[in-house]
Amino acid sequence: MTEGRKPHINVGTIGHVDHGKTTLTAALTTVLARKLSGANKVVKYDEIDKAPEEKARGITISTAHVEYETEGRHYAHVDCPGHADYIKNMITGAAQMDVAILVVSATDGAMPQTREHILLAKQVGVKDIVVWINKCDVVEDEEMLSLVDMEIRELLSQYGYDGDSIDAVRGSAVKALEEDADGPWSDKIMELVGALEKIELPMREKDKPFLMSVEDVFSIPGRGTVVTGRIERGVVRVGDKIDIVGLRELQSTVCTGVEMFHKALEAGEAGDNAGILLRGIKKEDVERGQVLSAPGQMKSYKKFKAEVYVLKKEEGGRHTPFFANYQPQFYVRTTDVTGSISLPAGVEMVMPGDNLSIEVALDKPVAIDKGLRFAVREGGRTVGSGIITEILE
C-alpha cells in the first residue's frame, strides 16, 4: 500500500425489500459529509436508486457504488436496488463485500429475503456482518425492539455467524437524513460507522501465497518457456520454486525470470499481468487453464458444491429448464471444463432465473478452491454464474 493511503474496506447493504437499504446508504454519505468533511460527498436517495446497469461475467446487474471515509479508513459501499440484482451480485462477485450491513425494519423484523441474504452472504464468504435496525422512530415499544434484536441475532447464529457478539445499532435512516448534523439520529449513524471501524481489515491479496492462472504459453529460443497471465495473489520472485497444477499430473519447477511489458523484473505481484519463465519445462508441458502456485498450496479436484444463479432468457440465458445430469462447461479461471450437475433432493428441474445449490463433477481435475467464482457456459455463451462453497474430491 502506498504511503498516505487509508486502508480500504468493501461494504454492502443487504436485507429485505423496502426495509431501508438505499435510505441508509444515503444517510451514511450525508451524515459523514456533515460530520467529517473532506472527501465525503452527499449522495441522495434518487441517485442511488437509479443505479446504472453493469455487466459482470456476462450478466447485467444494477448496482450503485458510493464511497465515504473516516479518519482512519476508506469505504467503498455497494447497494443494489432489486432483490434479483443482489443475488446476481453476490454470486458473480461483481462487487466484493468484506462486511455486510444487514438492514432490518423494526416494524417487520426478519422477512424471507432477510434470511436469503444472510444465507447467501455466508455461502459467498462475507466474513463480517453488522446489523442496522431501521425505522425505530415509528416503534415506541422498547420491548418490540428488543425482540427484533434477539430474533436477528438468533437468525445470524443459525447461519453460522456469531449472533451474540455482532453489533446491532437501532436507528432511523429517514430521520437522520431530515435532522441537522448534531441530532440524535445522526449519532446513531455514527454508531453504525463505529461498528464498521471495528471490523478487522481483510488480508490483502499480495500477502497470500503466490497463485497465477495460465493464459498463454510461449517458447522463447535460447531462454525457455514463458507462461503469461494475471497474478491472482501473492508475489513471485526469480529463483522461487513453483508448482504447475491442474488438468495433468502436478509438476514442480523454478521461476527463472519475471517480465512485464518486455522488461525483466525481480518479482511480480498480485494484480500484475506478467510473463513467468520456467526452468526445464517444454512448451507442450503447460497449457491454458492450469495454475502456477507456491509449492504445496494448490491441488486439483473434480467434485465440488456450488451456489449458482441461472440466467433468464432476457439475460441471454437458456430458454428452457434443465434437469439433473445436465452437462454444460464450467469456465474456471482461464478455461472451460465439461462437468455434470446433480440437483438437491426434491428438485426436479431448474428454471432460467433460479438460484440454488448444486453439486458438480468435472471431467478433468482443475485447480480450484472454496470461494472461487465460475461461469456456466453452453456453446460459448454464459448461461449461469456460480461460486464454489465446498470442495468434495
Curated annotation (Swiss-Prot):
GO cellular component: cytosol
EC nos: 3.6.5.3
Binding site for Mg(2+): T22
Residues passing through the membrane, by range: none
Localisation per UniProt entry: Cytoplasm
Ranges for region G3: 79-82
Region feature G1, mapped onto this chain: 15-22
The keyword Disulfide bond belongs to this UniProt entry's keyword annotation: no
Ranges where the record places region G2: 58-62
Pfam families in alphabetical order: GTP_EFTU, GTP_EFTU_D2, GTP_EFTU_D3
Catalytic activity: GTP + H2O = GDP + phosphate + H(+)
Keywords in alphabetical order: Cytoplasm, Elongation factor, GTP-binding, Hydrolase, Magnesium, Metal-binding, Nucleotide-binding, Protein biosynthesis
Domain tr-type G: 6-204
Residue segments, region G4: 134-137
InterPro entries xrefs: EF-Tu_GTP-bd, EF-Tu_GTPase, EFTu-like_2, EFTU_2, G_TR_CS, P-loop_NTPase, Small_GTP-bd, T_Tr_GTP-bd_dom
GO molecular function annotations of the record: GTP binding; GTPase activity; guanosine tetraphosphate binding; translation elongation factor activity
Complex and partners: Monomer.
NCBIfam families reported in the protein's UniProt record: EF-Tu (TIGR00485), PRK00049.1 (NF000766), PRK12735.1 (NF009372), PRK12736.1 (NF009373), small_GTP (TIGR00231)
Described purpose of this protein according to its UniProt entry: GTP hydrolase that promotes the GTP-dependent binding of aminoacyl-tRNA to the A-site of ribosomes during protein biosynthesis.
UniProt name for this protein: Elongation factor Tu
